Swiss-Prot record:
Residues 1-26 are annotated as: Disordered. The lineage of its organism: Eukaryota, Fungi, Dikarya, Ascomycota, Pezizomycotina. This is Guanine nucleotide-binding protein alpha-1 subunit. The keyword Nucleotide-binding applies. A lipid is attached at C3 (S-palmitoyl cysteine).
Length: 353
């Protein structure tokens, strides 16, 4: 009698082989799938990086998608002017030209969320006239004393185009639009052989308790810091310096037991605003041990060292880049460098280098 395998045994062996093959496929896929967590304090530029990934790696925004940004851009623009006008009241700064006073009422009459495909002409005219006023400009220069959207000046400078009846948001308009991130958003894109799953979590303090759900099997952390905010206070706690908050947060992430083996890439972001601010808002006023005056390179080195020196693990390397998240050309270059870093890290973890 032969000792061939029974049908049941053959089926069992086939099942085992299929399971083994599936596990191999899963391991291969896992090696090629990069789970990247975007972290950083509120308004550090995380959502802007995600928009850049869509522009660079997903063919950009369709006409319908651009249309959907209109109301956000209109609302951002009107709300920014309202914030300045309210700050003028609290700082007791008058309009230079009282003839534009009626435009102030136009702005205050607008709802928080502007709806519609076209910005009402009287609103566009009001913003254009007020932005030219020397009193408004004077208040704008003191924007570190209140909470003003980073994109305010950009939208004000472009108000004639934004208020035009045939307006269609361009890439910069979309990149600079601001909606507070709540919860967790995921974006998937492919660079070379790697599939990236990038998670953006809300940066405000109230959102941070939700991060824990993203911690498992994270390949890389991309941590963003708005270095231009060295002289500003938190939106949610106006007793805390934004840069100090970012340092505290980076310390807790960099040295967390969850991330001992996770590579960390640090984007020191908003370098354009930082460069503009240094000559008019001395960094030494907020960081007394800083001795570099308004020298841009010295200030960059100081901030970089403040963050990197928080790393308590000798074997852990922090990869750093100075960035302007709204500059698509620069972000394309930086993300290519990030991709190279991740490939090297992957090879190291697999024991291939």
């Amino acid at each position: 009698m032969g000792c061939g395998m029974s049908t049941e045994e053959k089926e069992g062996k086939a099942r085992n082989e299929e399971i083994e093959n599936q596990l191999k496929r899963d391991r291969m896929q896992q090696r090629n799938e990069i789970k990247m967590l975007l972290l950083g304090a509120g308004e550090s530029g995380k959502s802007t990086i995600l928009k850049q990934m869509k522009l660079i790696h997903e063919g950009g925004y369709s006409r319908d998608e651009r249309e959907s940004f209109k109301e956000i851009i209109f609302s951002n623009t009107v709300q920014s002017m309202r914030v300045i006008l309210e700050a003028m009241e609290s700082l007791e700064l008058p309009l230079a030209d009282q003839r534009v006073e009626y435009h102030v009422q136009t702005i205050f009459m607008q709802p928080a969320q502007i709806e519609g495909d076209v910005l009402p002409p009287e609103v566009g005219n009001a913003i254009e006239a007020l932005w030219r006023d020397a009193g408004v400009q004077s208040c704008f220069k003191r924007s570190r004393e209140y909470q003003l959207n980073d994109s305010a000046r950009y939208y004000f400078d472009n108000i004639a185009r934004i208020a035009a009846p045939d307006y269609m948001p361009n890439d910069q308009d979309v990149l600079r639009s601001r909606v507070k991130t709540t919860g967790i958003t995921e974006t998937t894109f492919i660079i070379g052989d790697l599939t990236y799953r990038m998670f953006d979590v809300g940066g405000q303090r109230s959102e941070r308790k939700k991060w824990i759900h993203c911690f498992e099997n994270v390949t890389t952390i991309l941590f963003l810091v708005a270095i231009s905010e060295y002289d500003q206070l938190l939106f949610e706690d106006e007793t805390v310096n934004r840069m100090q908050e970012a340092l505290t947060l980076f310390d807790s992430i960099c040295n967390s037991r969850w991330f001992i083996k996770t590579s960390i890439i640090l984007f020191l972001n908003k370098i354009d605003r930082f460069k503009e601010k240094l000559p008019v808002s001395p960094m030494k006023n907020y960081f007394p041990d800083y001795e570099g005056g308004d020298d841009y390179a010295a200030a960059c080195d100081y901030i970089l060292n403040r963050f990197v020196s928080l790393n308590q693990h000798e074997t852990k390397q922090i990869y750093t880049h100075f960035t302007c998240a709204t500059d698509t050309t620069q972000i394309r270059f930086v993300m290519a460098a990030v991709n190279d870093i991740i490939i090297q890290e992957n090879l190291r973890l697999c024991g291939l280098i």
